[in-house]
Amino acid sequence: VRILKKYNLEDFLFIDIETAPSVPELVIDTPLYDAWSYYCIKNDIEDVVGSYFTEAPLYAEFGRIACITIGAVRNDKIVLKTFSNEDEKELLEEFNQAVSKFANNKTWLCGHVITGFDAPFIMKRCLINRVEMHQIFDMAHEKPWTVPYFDTALLWKSTGFKVSTLVSVTTALGLPSPKEEFNGSDVGRLYYEGKIKDIVKYCERDVVAVVNVVRVLRGEEPIEVSEPVEQEPLGILEYIFLGGEYTAEIAEQLKTAISKMTKTDKAKAIEILNVLPCKAKGKETSITKKDIKELING
């Protein structure tokens, strides 16, 4: 595990996903039923319908992503961002856009069993949903030693044979267990009961646990989650840049944000604003130069 000390923890992108069955109920005489039935025959499973709900979330061909949490370490605090959406395609598009902003050639993905589950599941669901994935998930053609992943399950396993659960590792290291009210087998049921907020909290606890496992393996003390802050002005600018409508409400948000900025940040914001009245990524922005002048002077 000494290799962990060679890298800056701020270059790590921590990821965890929670998955559910792709449909709330497996219907007989459908292509999905036939495919799952074949899987059951191959694995000597008798209860085709019953097994689907508990086991389908383990396979990208039969499950779907309920939410994805990404975490990063900034100023010795954990910063979290979670993506959840009933429309899985939109969820994956938003997620890949966020990864594109963070990831570079120094980025390491980190998670527990990320090489065997999270990363390939994301890759396959992107392909199924026709979503362009970030290249950091497209690793099937790479040599194993060039894949930029740190898997805490493999780091803990070392040269042994057994892979330990995240709960086992956190317990052994004296860290809080991420599994408080339920475990992964309950996610499918909770998802279709509409309890996505509970799933999100569960997912975020996993990411926090992995961050602190890595900290301890590096010989460092555990850290806490940063308190949530208001949306950064860049979020509003990005919304306009991507073709979002420039409304009176957005104008007020921008005015308030600019008024609170330092001189340096204000100059950067103005620089961004001045390039907005143009076609951005194929979309026509609705803000005008007159609007920008009013913002700067207001």
Functional labels for PLM-detected ranges:
Residues 1-3, 220-229, 289-298:
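Short amphipathic alpha-helical segments
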Residues 231-298:
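Interfaces that engage single-stranded nucleic acids at replication/repair/recombination sites
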